[in-house]
């Protein structure tokens, strides 16, 4: 079954735009990591005493949700995370320095993927307009590379979250309280995963278009 270039162009434009919008939304929102302490705040006297000592100066709920740049409490303004690129004048432990390095890695990789998609969109438009085989091939490879950058950024974020959880676990004296805390990844991370899939499909569409154009030119030469 032959696939027309027009159909591939439409598919590439749709999936490429979807990938860009979803990744931009994921980067700009603060629901990558969610900590829900509602069950803990409603539990027995021991936890109430601990939470009471914490809440004397801050009576609002302890639940929070975090993004790539900041963390937000339910009834408090969002606070920015520590800048991972200014470590020279900061004294931190080796584990904290490793966390900051991981933080700096994914805040570079994910916006970089957006930039690659912008360049891919421009070269993709020109490649379909000019019907240039090499440009179609280059654009497909560019989108696939961008998808790998997105995957790397998301993977580093997941590893960063796990390492931060282990660090908090080591510092927490009442480890049993974590059984009453619901910790999960949020919908911002889900948008990142969907963007990664759409970016893969965009790259595949451009490579399929390059192959279709090559086959068409071979047939024309044979005639």
UniProtKB/Swiss-Prot annotation:
Subcellular location: Cell junction, Tight junction; Lateral cell membrane; Apical cell membrane
Gene Ontology CC, one term: apicolateral plasma membrane
Residues spanning the membrane: 7-27, 106-126, 134-154, 189-209
Superkingdom, taxonomy of origin: Eukaryota
Principal location listed in the UniProt entry: other
Glycosylation site residues: 55, 89
Pfam families: Claudin_2 (PF13903)
Disease as annotated in the protein's UniProt record: Chromosomal aberrations involving TMEM114 may be a cause of congenital and juvenile cataracts. Translocation t(16;22) (p13.3;q11.2).
Protein name: Transmembrane protein 114
Lineage, top ranks: Eukaryota, Metazoa, Chordata, Craniata, Vertebrata
């Amino acid at each position: 079954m032959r696939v027309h270039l027009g159909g591939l162009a439409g598919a590439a434009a749709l999936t490429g735009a979807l990938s860009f919008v979803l990744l931009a939304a994921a980067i700009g929102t603060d629901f990558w990591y969610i900590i829900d302490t509602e069950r803990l705040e409603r539990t027995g006297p021991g936890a109430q005493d601990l939470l009471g000592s914490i809440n004397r100066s801050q009576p609002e709920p302890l639940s929070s949700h975090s993004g790539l740049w900041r963390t937000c409490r339910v009834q408090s303004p969002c606070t920015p995370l520590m800048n991972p690129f200014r470590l020279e004048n900061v004294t931190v432990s080796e584990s904290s320095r490793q966390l900051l390095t991981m933080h700096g890695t994914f805040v570079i990789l994910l916006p970089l993927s957006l930039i690659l998609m912008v360049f891919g969109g421009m070269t993709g438009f020109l490649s379909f307009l000019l019907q240039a085989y090499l440009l179609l091939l280059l654009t497909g490879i560019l989108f696939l590379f961008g998808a790998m950058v997105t995957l790397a950024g998301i993977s580093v974020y997941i590893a960063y979250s796990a390492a931060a959880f282990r660090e908090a676990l080591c510092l927490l004296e009442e480890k049993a309280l974590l059984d009453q805390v619901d910790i999960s990844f949020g919908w911002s991370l889900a948008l990142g995963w969907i963007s990664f899939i759409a970016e893969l499909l965009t790259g595949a569409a451009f490579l399929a278009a390059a192959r279709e154009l090559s086959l068409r030119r071979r047939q024309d030469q044979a005639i």
